[in-house]
UniProtKB/Swiss-Prot annotation:
Transit peptide: 1-61
Protein name: Thioredoxin-dependent peroxide reductase, mitochondrial
Gene: PRDX3
Provenance organism: Homo sapiens (Human)
Superkingdom per UniProt: Eukaryota
Thioredoxin domain segment(s): 63-221
Length: 256
């Protein structure tokens, strides 16, 4: 893996940095130190070929909240078997589509296992979860067949989708073009195929499954009740009627 990541930093940068471990962000790995290593900020501002290695796929074409999610189709591992999977398979359901950098890494299995362990709670609210990386479906299966105590995934209750061509990651605006890896992008897509939420993390930090589930429930509540959800809303907390007069009911209740 060190060799693969090292290809991110070709030419002069490669003389200073031999690898970026997956527990460290690209920004941290290139932070100026006493030895005078070049900072990532300088690389990005220089317009050099090295800087382009860290650019993502064209942000001007990246999907946005309220827009329809880009169509995708590929081979996934579902219940230990290979299966064709597309966005059309989730019509009428909510979908959490989350991207991760690579199989057999460090933060990634913690996220995937956490989502898998909560799969039934997502199913209870008519929501499916799909994880995506640029690995092959064969790699996904090998990782699933690796015990968790050895960094593997074990039995999975969610689908792992292969994006070997990198087109899905590119279409969703999370592909790091130089390395060919995807950032930790997460998209909540409603039953009509519309993006309700998106977030993108740098490589070293995993995401909250509980927060993702809370957001799905919040969007569903708004659709069902026509009221809006305040900060830190949970299903047992009050909501707001979206009008100047009616909203006072909420503010009076929480500011007693």
């Amino acid at each position: 893996m060190a060799a693969a990541v090292g290809r991110l930093l070709r030419a002069s940068v490669a003389r200073h940095v031999s690898a970026i471990p997956w527990g460290i962000s690209a920004t941290a790995a290139l932070r100026p130190a006493a030895c005078g290593r070049t900072s990532l900020t300088n690389l990005l501002c220089s317009g050099s070929s090295q800087a382009k290695l860290f650019s993502t796929s064209s942000s001007c074409h990246a999907p946005a909240v309220t827009q329809h999610a880009p169509y995708f189709k590929g081979t996934a591992v579902v219940n230990g078997e290979f299966k064709d999977l597309s966005l059309d398979d989730f019509k009428g359901k909510y979908l959490v589509l989350f991207f991760y950098p690579l199989d057999f890494t460090f933060v990634c299995p913690t996220e995937i296992v956490a989502f898998s362990d909560k799969a039934n709670e997502f199913h209870d609210v008519n929501c499916e979860v799909v994880a995506v990386s640029v690995d092959s479906h064969f790699s996904h299966l090998a990782w699933i067949n690796t015990p968790r105590k050895n960094g593997g995934l074990g039995h999975m209750n969610i689908a792992l989708l292969s994006d070997l061509t990198k087109q899905i990651s590119r279409d969703y605006g999370v592909l790091l073009e130089g390395s060919g890896l995807a950032l930790r992008g997460l998209f909540i897509i409603d039953p009509n195929g519309v993006i309700k939420h998106l977030s993108v993390n740098d490589l070293p930090v995993g995401r909250s499954v509980e927060e993702t589930l809370r957001l799905v429930k919040a969007f569903q509540y708004v659709e069902t009740h026509g009221e809006v959800c305040p900060a830190n809303w949970t299903p047992d907390s009050p909501t707001i009627k979206p009008s100047p007069a009616a909203s006072k009911e909420y503010f009076q209740k929480v500011n007693q």
